[in-house]
Each structure stands twice: as structure tokens, then as C-alpha cells.
């Protein structure tokens, strides 16, 4: 008798995606982060759903409803901090996942890569809107500053900002629509994840060597299912430690003050996972230029496949490119630090140098070094 998982219309789709899927035999731990992102998404949707049952999207009661969740709802504090710190874990996994793709040349699967960029934008938009919902000081002023950036768009900017706000300032209408979109977006992300996997399974996974792995494949289950479960346990251990021991470590104390349009906080800054982009935005003195640089800091990933000059796919055997890759990582960490600092000497100049270096590495240095490496190998 044929196994039901191979004949049932629904089960056979799952079977070909997670059970009998042929996978390269040499995938390292860097390949765990895709499945970890899936777990993060599921966790965020679940905790978010239960939080939404108690949250009220109204300027008069939003802050108090979050306090009520933490104090009066059974395990509400756990839901709230799992959701807030789950977002941080989500972005840690996202950035490592993208970094893995850059390092091992996975971006040569252009469809999968481009859907991934869309996913990155969607998750960033979702996180931004979620940060506004507790209606603390940083929620309100973060929303005001970031949405106001759209006013830099020539001709339609001001109207566009007021259209998004639903009035002449960030107010009740803004909070309500942000809640609606924050609820909707994770489901759009889930749909995009399916498309991402669909394109990935058209080609099969890349592997650390960057060499076609067709002659040496193993079934996904049990080899990579057990490996993924180990990854889940490790990530959930870190998340649990964060939630139970220092839940506010990654948050901003200003967000424990209710939103007040008449009092601007001394340092307006987004959550830590947006600081690198915020630093790039601030490093350009012109408003429109800053906004363009902000968008391009992520959109630049779309041109990476076109700039791949090496005859080898992966950086595994390219030590010069490896040095540049880790310089890029150091640059991003520097930008993240700068984004959280006040706009004064020496932080401004450090941010400007790091911003230029970030774009230089991706657009100029990496293609050049790839050509040099080809020459060194007499290719």
C-alpha cells in the first residue's frame, strides 16, 4: 500500500517540502535560520493574536490597555514580552539569514532572493507599525518622525503624509490604521514566505561550497528536521532567558511614558534593529537624500546578483572577499551603534564614513576584489 503522505493531495505537498525533499548533505548551521524565521513568524502571529484580544487601538486607552495586559491578564506580561523580544529574535535571524545569502552566493537564485527582499521590507514595515501601538513617547515620536520623511517626496509629499496620518498630525486615525495594518501584514508575510519557498524548491538549496550538490543529496527528514529542532530549542532558550530575566533590555525607557505631543524626548530613535538604517538616514544633511539613502540601504540587495563578478559562487574559497564581508558586518555594527548616539561630534563623522563605506563595499569593492581573485586564479 502506498504511504498516505505521498498520495493525499495536501499531505504530498507537505511531504515534498519537508519530508522527502532532497537536500545537500553538507548544509552548515547557517542554514538553520530559515526555519528559525518560520518559528519566529508563528510565535509572533500567535502572541500577537492573543494580545489583540485585549488591546484597544484608541489614543485615550492604548497605553492603559498595554498596562492592563501586563498587570491583569493571565500571563499577559509573558505574551507582551514574548512578542516584543520575539521581534528582536526575528530580526537577528533575518540579518543572519541575509548575511548567509551574501556570503555563500545564494543571491544567484534571483527569484528567491527578490522575494526575500520583499519579505524584509514587509517585516520591517510590520515591526515599525507594531512599535507605534503601545502609544508611549517613543511610539508617538517615532511614528511622527518616520512618517514625516515621506514629506521629502517632491510635489505630493505633504499630501501623502497627511493621507497616511488621516489628519494633520499623528492621532487616533493613525493609531487605528496602524493597528489594522499591523494585524494584516503578518499574513501577507506568510503568503510571501510560501512564494519564497516555492521558488527555492524550484532550484533546490545552495550549499557552503557553492558547487552543485545534485550527486550528493540526503532526505530532509530525519537529518535536517532534527537539526532544525536543535536550532529551535537553542533560539527559544535565548528568547526565554531574555523574556524572563531582562525583558526591557532591548526596549526604550521613554516608551513607559504615555505619548505626549507637547513634549519631545531628547533622543528620538527607533528600535535597535533599525538603527543602522537610521544612522544612514541621519548621515546625509539633505532630507530627500537621507530618505533615498535609507531606502537604498535595503534596496541595494537587489543589485547584488548583477554585481557578482566572481567565477566562484560561494566566498568559502575566496579569502579577500571574506575580509570585505566581515568589514561589511563591522560597518553595519558601527552604524547600529551610531544610530543610537546623539547628533554631535564625533558621532556624525563616524556615521558618514561608515555609510559611505557600506555602499562602497557592496557596489564597488566586492566586484573589484572578485575580479582580482579571478585573475589570481588565472581564470
UniProtKB/Swiss-Prot annotation:
Is Transmembrane among the key words of this record?
yes
Family membership: Belongs to the cytochrome b family.
Protein location: Mitochondrion inner membrane
Tell me yes or no: is Coiled coil among this UniProt entry's keywords: no
Q: Where are the transmembrane segments?
A: 33-53, 77-98, 113-133, 178-198, 226-246, 288-308, 320-340, 347-367
* Chief subcellular location: mitochondrion
CDD domains assigned to the protein according to its UniProt record, in alphabetical order: cytochrome_b_C, Cytochrome_b_N
State where heme b b562 binds.
83, 182
Its name, as the record gives it, is Cytochrome b
The record, for PANTHER family, names: CYTOCHROME B
Alphabetical list of SUPFAM superfamilies matching this protein: a domain/subunit of cytochrome bc1 complex (Ubiquinol-cytochrome c reductase) (SSF81648), Transmembrane di-heme cytochromes (SSF81342)
How is the protein disposed in the membrane?
A: Multi-pass membrane protein
Cofactor names: heme b
Q: How does it assemble?
A: The cytochrome bc1 complex contains 11 subunits: 3 respiratory subunits (MT-CYB, CYC1 and UQCRFS1), 2 core proteins (UQCRC1 and UQCRC2) and 6 low-molecular weight proteins (UQCRH/QCR6, UQCRB/QCR7, UQCRQ/QCR8, UQCR10/QCR9, UQCR11/QCR10 and a cleavage product of UQCRFS1). This cytochrome bc1 complex then forms a dimer.
Query: What GO cellular component entries does it have?
Result: mitochondrial inner membrane; respiratory chain complex III
Binding-site list for a ubiquinone: 201
What does the UniProt function comment say about this protein? Component of the ubiquinol-cytochrome c reductase complex (complex III or cytochrome b-c1 complex) that is part of the mitochondrial respiratory chain. The b-c1 complex mediates electron transfer from ubiquinol to cytochrome c. Contributes to the generation of a proton gradient across the mitochondrial membrane that is then used for ATP synthesis.
Task: Tell me the disulfide pairings in this chain.
Answer: none
Biological processes per GO annotation:
mitochondrial electron transport, ubiquinol to cytochrome c
Checking InterPro entries in the record gives: Cyt_b/b6_C, Cyt_b/b6_C_sf, Cyt_b/b6_N, Cytb/b6-like_sf, Cytochrome_b, Cytochrome_b_C_euk/bac, Cytochrome_b_N_euk/bac, Di-haem_cyt_TM
What is the UniProt remark on how the cofactor binds and its stoichiometry?
Binds 2 heme b groups non-covalently.
